[in-house]
Amino acid sequence: MKLLNLSAQQLLKKLKDKQLTSVELCKAYIKQKKKYDKNVQAWEYFNEKKLLSDAKKSDNQRKKLKSLGVLHGLPVALKDIISTSEMPTKYGARIKLKKKNNLDAKIVELLKKAGACLLYTSD
């Protein structure tokens, strides 16, 4: 079965059982994005470097057996109407906004607390 066809629950089990690293999973999503980005154009904001940095941090925490959140190391995409301090949020507007918000929406706070890696914002 293809990696990106697995459910979040299946991916989390593979991460927990150390059959997969967060870096490997994020690289699979990056590869998928690069393959289809030109035609799909569904990504408003994408920071590959930050994503891989967060994934590496998650993998290192897993190796050190630190207390892990329920979504630890799982890449999660956000809709562009959800405010996040890590990425510009356009709230669906067609204007180009370069500035990031200072605040995270409550759902973003909860995702981060659970250990998720923010993948990108989608249109």
Predicted features and spans:
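Enzymes and membrane/adaptor proteins characterized by extended Gly/Ser/Thr/Asp/Glu-rich
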Residues: 70-110, 114
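Non-membrane alpha-helical structural segments and their capping/turn regions in soluble enzymes
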Residues: 23, 52, 105-108
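An N-terminal boundary/leader segment
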Residues: 1-50
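Long amphipathic alpha-helix in the N-terminal Rossmann-like dinucleotide-binding domain
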Residues: 51-56, 112-116
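Immediate post-signal peptide segment of exported/extracytoplasmic ligand-binding proteins
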Residues: 58-74
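Conserved small/polar residues in nucleotide/adenosyl-binding loops
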Residues: 120-123
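Generic non-transmembrane alpha-helix signal with a bias for helix starts/N-cap capping motifs
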Residues: 8, 62, 104-105
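Secretory-pathway/luminal and periplasmic proteins that interact with or process carbohydrate-rich
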Residues: 34-39, 64, 83-89
